[in-house]
Amino acid sequence: MKTKTTYLLLLFLFQISFAQVEYGTPSNKDIPEKLQNLDIEIEVKHFPKENDPIKIKDKYYWKHATAILSKKGDVKIIEFGAYLFYNNTWNLRKSYNLKDLDNNFGTKKQIMLQGEPYVWSKNWRIDNRLFGGWAMWYFIGINHNGDTICGYETINTTSNLLNK
């Protein structure tokens, strides 16, 4: 009986923890702390910016592309990743291995050449659950003057299934 009660209590607490997540919508002022004091010199663009999913078999796909560009000079990327917005704040989802930048965006040794766009054409979100939310991709680099700079952009993934 004690084991069953403990099990039910744990199950209840587990369900409550998921129910308490509030996804919400970030304001333009909501920026992760690590980016707040850095100059923005890397352009980041998502297409489409509002991303509706399609369902293929038992998975949902939010298909989009992400592009990065430096207009002021060459940039050495030293960190990149993604945040998710929930509970009224940006939460780090993942910082990626720098080799992933070369593989996915086509840079060489994480160097962005001035005026050269780099595009990850299959930067897709895939999940077995259908839910929307906000993500922010960020890039931190060192510019030609040795300054640490950044770029970031949000993307809204919706729960508006296209192929119902």
Regions from the PLM with identified roles:
Residues D100-M136:
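Short, solvent-exposed, Trp/other aromatic-anchored flexible loops in extracytoplasmic proteins
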